[in-house]
């Protein structure tokens, strides 16, 4: 009986330590204090087949994951296959600029615009003036939205 009680005490102490470790690892940061940027692009598939769109987005996702600092990168297609939403998240404006430089100068720029037309481009988070200038100089029409509440948990 003493062994069972001792084992239960050790188990419970271990569970408490795990909870404390999780609490210590995850930090909550107000959105307004975060440098993260989230890109939301609403894309038209320009009458390309859903199969061609999916093949290209899978290829591009594999290409990006090997080269980019984005922490989120995903394509989502509508039921009719005519619209795609692209969501990207970057640690800061500089990472977003680097992505833009790599995209514009990379091997997939022309193919992207053969497959897609950008209908709406929204940036969530605090974008620096340097980021805004870069996107403007490169012809991107962007709707910027800054945080008015919320948090990021890391």
Locate predicted features:
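Sec-dependent N-terminal signal peptides
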Residues: 4-12
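Short S/T/G/P-rich N-terminal loop/turn motif that feeds into the first structured element of a domain
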Residues: 15-84, 91-101, 115-154
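A short gly/proline-enriched turn/hairpin at secondary-structure junctions
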Residues: 87-88, 111
